[in-house]
């Protein structure tokens, strides 16, 4: 029997976050990089509560990093925005590599300046896995063809290098929206680049191009970078109860389109509900991950059997008035619904409308 530890990761614990962007300028283009950074500074200065520092390596002056300190929710809102894409655009033509690292601040010594939040109240327990998602839409009417293309490709090689491994890839659709989730042990960006280079994956991506609502040209680095930046949907919360894995465990994705401006609040609500549910050993949801980008919220749940046996817990609306709170944040019309689910029957109906169609779920063999 497979067992797993209790794990919990969240962007909603109120702690401050240190963001470090490692920059490798193209050879002999350092001055262009500095000029591009000067352009960025003006835009960064216009973002409330944001400042950054440009640092140059003492050992290797060609290596740079840009650091900034945030509260996690406003950072996630900004990094997923069109304004962020425009802000970093000047860097794209003069750097070979950009790598972003994000850390919650756990301990602090000294310092008396104002802060945007507190410290992490407890050290998080992780499982060595990074979770990420991509989402995009295809042209209406092409859904069946897209599902066929996505279901038919050969899985890429799981091992990226000695320290990075692609553990699981799952694809879902809801109407004309595609969601691809990945679990990676090690370096997420290295794994994504590894997957993108695989011939079978490139063939699928090319076959998808005519069906996409947003145009992209994968032979143009800037076009490809912009597409995947807009498609990125980071995990804002993950919790797993741990212990022996129940028999018949299945993964579902639930789609929660939020009302304008309510995406972060909806993701926060679901995250808190999942933390509560994880403390109940008899609950049906053994693990849950919330992904959010603007008004798009997707929640992965692992449940044994049929989630309709307990639709309230499966949807994350257990507890007093939680269904009403969800209804205020959810764009019910986008799911073909009106009003909060006030009965188990209505909760089952919401679950049916929110449940995404599984296209493929591939796990790498255990090493």
Curated annotation (Swiss-Prot):
Question: Could you tell me which InterPro entries the record lists for this protein?
Answer: ABM_dom, Dimeric_a/b-barrel, SchA_CurD-like
**Range of residues in the leader sequence:** none
State the pathway, as annotated in the record: Antibiotic biosynthesis; curamycin biosynthesis
Q: Does the keyword Nucleus apply?
A: no
> What processes in GO biological process is this protein linked to?
antibiotic biosynthetic process
Q: What is this protein called?
A: Polyketide synthase CurD
Q: Which Pfam families match?
A: ABM (PF03992), SchA_CurD (PF04486)
List, alphabetically, the PROSITE patterns matched.
Answer: ABM (PS51725)
This protein's species is Streptomyces cyaneus (Streptomyces curacoi)
Listed A to Z, the keywords are: Antibiotic biosynthesis
The UniProt entry's sequence similarity note says:
Belongs to the SchA/CurD family.
Ranges for domain ABM come to 15-106
């Amino acid at each position: 029997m497979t067992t797993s530890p209790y794990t919990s990761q969240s962007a909603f614990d109120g702690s401050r976050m240190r963001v470090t962007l490692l920059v490798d300028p193209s050879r002999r283009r350092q001055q262009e990089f500095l000029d591009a950074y000067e352009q960025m500074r003006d835009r960064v200065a216009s973002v409330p509560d944001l400042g950054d520092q440009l640092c140059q390596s003492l050992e290797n002056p060609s290596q740079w990093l840009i650091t900034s300190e945030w509260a996690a929710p406003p950072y996630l809102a900004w990094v997923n925005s069109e304004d962020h894409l425009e802000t970093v655009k000047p860097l794209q033509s003069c750097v070979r590599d950009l790598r972003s690292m994000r850390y919650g601040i756990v301990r602090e010594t000294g310092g008396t300046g104002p802060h945007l939040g507190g410290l992490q109240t407890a050290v998080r327990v992780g499982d060595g896995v990074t979770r990420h998602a991509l989402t995009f839409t295809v042209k209406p009417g092409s859904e069946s063809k897209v599902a066929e293309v996505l279901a038919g490709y050969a899985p890429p090689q799981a091992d990226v290098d000695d320290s990075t491994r692609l553990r699981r890839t799952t694809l879902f659709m809801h109407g004309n929206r595609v969601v691809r989730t990945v679990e990676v042990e090690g370096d997420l960006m290295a794994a994504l680049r590894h997957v993108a280079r695989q011939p079978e994956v490139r063939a699928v991506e090319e076959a998808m191009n005519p069906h996409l609502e947003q145009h992209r040209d994968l032979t143009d680095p800037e076009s490809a970078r912009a597409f995947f930046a807009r498609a990125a949907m980071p995990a804002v919360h993950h919790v797993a109860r741990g212990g022996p894995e129940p028999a018949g465990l299945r993964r579902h994705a639930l789609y929660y389109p939020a009302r304008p401006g309510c995406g972060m609040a909806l993701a926060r609500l679901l995250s808190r509900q999942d933390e509560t549910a994880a403390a109940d050993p008899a609950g049906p949801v053994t693990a849950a991950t919330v992904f959010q980008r603007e008004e798009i919220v997707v929640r992965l749940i692992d449940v044994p059997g049929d989630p309709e046996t307990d639709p309230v817990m499966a949807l994350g609306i257990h507890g007093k008035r939680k269904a009403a709170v969800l209804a205020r944040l959810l764009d019910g019309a986008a799911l073909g619904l009106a009003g909060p689910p006030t009965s188990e029957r209505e909760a089952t109906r919401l679950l049916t409308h929110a449940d995404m169609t599984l296209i493929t779920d591939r796990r790498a063999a255990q090493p």
